UniProtKB/Swiss-Prot annotation:
Membership in a protein family: Belongs to the bacterial ribosomal protein bL25 family.
The UniProt record lists the keyword RNA-binding: yes
Protein name listed in UniProt: Large ribosomal subunit protein bL25
Name of the coding gene: rplY
SUPFAM superfamilies to which the protein is assigned, alphabetical: Ribosomal protein L25-like
Keywords assigned by UniProt, alphabetized: Ribonucleoprotein, Ribosomal protein, RNA-binding, rRNA-binding
Assembly mode: Part of the 50S ribosomal subunit; part of the 5S rRNA/L5/L18/L25 subcomplex. Contacts the 5S rRNA. Binds to the 5S rRNA independently of L5 and L18.
Function: This is one of the proteins that binds to the 5S RNA in the ribosome where it forms part of the central protuberance.
Keyword presence, Cytoplasm: no
Length: 94
């Protein structure tokens, strides 16, 4: 099982996302269920190492946000066209 630590994002938009990426993080969103969508920032290197395994896309993952565990599945992944970088991930609540 994969566990990912995340921070809540207060800023959104192109500039905020670029600042995250230069800080070795990237934006993600958690949606679905009866709760409101939650914008989070994830550590790029940790998630990059996890997503190499096929189980990352098929199993239920745990994202820890402010000490609260959220069970999710990876729904959509956006990658850089030619660099080995993740740009954004959509997670749906499990």
């Amino acid at each position: 099982m994969f566990t990912i630590n995340a921070e809540v994002r207060n800023e959104q938009g192109k500039g905020a996302s670029r600042r995250l990426r230069t800080a070795n993080k990237f934006p993600a969103i958690i949606y679905g269920g009866n709760e409101a969508p939650l914008a989070v920032a994830l550590d790029h290197d940790k998630v990059m190492n996890m997503q190499v395994k096929a189980e990352f896309y098929s199993e239920v993952l745990t994202i820890v946000v402010d000490g609260k565990e959220i069970k999710v599945k990876a729904q959509d992944v956006q990658r850089h066209p030619y660099k080995p970088k993740l740009l954004h991930i959509d997670f749906v609540r499990a």
